[in-house]
Amino acid sequence: ERQIEKTREVVAIAKKFAFEYFDGDRKYGYGGYNYNPKYWSQVSIDLINYYNLNNNSKVLDVGCAKGFLLYELKKNLPDLTIEGIDISDYAIQNAKKEIKKYLKVGNATDLPYADKSYDLVVSIVTLHNLKKDKLKKALAEITRVSRKDSFITLDAYSNIEEKRNMEDWNLTAETMMSKEEWRTFFIESNFHGDYYW
């Protein structure tokens, strides 16, 4: 169980995705969402290698937060075209200054980009924060703006204990499902991109 009680008030504050969620007290979320080069550097290298990204590629991060992944991608491929979108004005305003100009506030359910604009669209631990109907729309939007690949990660459980842990700890998830339920949901949503838990 959480060290601090998960009250309606705590959840409501976390779901604003503002200072309290990213950089405030741990009971509201991250407790300090800071850049960790060791983590993001490896993730960016893995994405570059797996999706064969190069300096001519275009990448969109849906739910980019402060843009740490895009920053690392740009460091590794300086001419890569990057864009990020996040629902949090706070996160965008507090993004890495080197890439802030590539980020905007917006919603995953209505991406302001043309069809087939990106070689890769990523969404890292974001989409489970939407209710199923909006989640289905976000998956359709990711598919629409991707001309080639998409990759999402989200929270999923494998057993009752993991489910209980998610229910105790996750403050912002609107959709909690088992891995098998997610797979079925992706099929029903006509999502054919890559995913990981």
What are these regions (language model features)?
Residues 119:
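Conserved acidic residues
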